[in-house]
Amino acid sequence: MNRRLAMGSLLVAAAGLAAAAIGWRRRQGALPPQMALAPRVVLSPPDSIGAVYHLGHSLVGRDMPAMLAQFGGHGYASQLGWGTPLQTHWTEGEALPGYELHASGIPPAPARQALAADGFDVLVMTEMVEIRDSLRYFDSPYWLAEWAALARQGNPAIRIYLYETWHNLDDPDGWLERIDADLEAHWLGRVIAPAEATGRSGGIFLIPGGQAMAAVARAAEAGDLPGLTSRGDLFARTEDGGLDTIHINDLGAYVVALTHWAVMYQRSPVGLPHQMQRADGSVAQGFGPEAALRVQQLVRDVVAALPQTGVAPARMAG
């Protein structure tokens, strides 16, 4: 055997061992290594946004995109499932559990079909929570990159965002504690950074929904929001009247919609309307004027503090 063949054999063997090791780690449910996120560029403010695609699950829901569109005036479409990871959205499509399509101002369309065409200015994705399980078992960064690459084939100028969410209020590690810790450790360091490292995704920016929810919850519990006293005031109720520990109510949807708008439109949300409609046209529960103004200020401050959004802090002045 000559030297080239010998080296080739060694490389093949090494690759096989590496693949086996990766497979073993995945079977064991180990988290992938955390990566440093590349420095963010500051995005230019959009000239206009005509259409937005939302890909996710019930923490996107029907009403939050509808509120966002009321702020921005854009059309939107969404593909949702029950706690669906990005991988399952790709591999199962309309067969995924809880499959739903929604739209306003534009026709509804399955995600892969819609994004392959040049019809959307913005794609917002989110990942299944528990986020650690998405990373262990559903290869979040690979599928984030896959969706981003598809969207850029349809529209090379599309802006792509990952919507950071939250875990259950009764999470054993603490709800606020998880939001504080998971942003850098998981959403940025284990989802966005390795997705971008594939070289297929282009830049992916952050919509800090969890951070905004945490800021508003802290303000409520500090007595800084008239009419609210706890984080539970942002969450829905179950059919028997108990607290739904993961799904937001109209007030929570308003917080998240403000956050999306501030990032996507690169404008301070201070002064936006606080009386909104749900997706079905019914009147949403709203903050009072004083509380709404404070919530808008909190969201503005969250977005301004995070360069991962692509928003220059000066854009949040006001």
Question: Across the structure, where does each feature detected by a protein language model lie?
Answer:
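Membrane-interface motif at the C-terminal end of an N-terminal transmembrane signal
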Residues: 19-31
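N-terminal export leaders
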Residues: 2-12
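Conserved catalytic region of serine esterases and O-acyltransferases that act on ester linkages
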Residues: 231-318
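Conserved SGNH/GDSL esterase-like catalytic core that processes O-acyl groups on lipids
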Residues: 55, 61-147
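Alpha-helical cap/lid subdomain in secreted, periplasmic
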Residues: 109-250
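N-terminal module-boundary/linker segments of secreted carbohydrate-active enzymes
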Residues: 32-66, 70-71
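Core hydrophobic alpha-helical transmembrane segments of single-pass membrane proteins
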Residues: 11-19
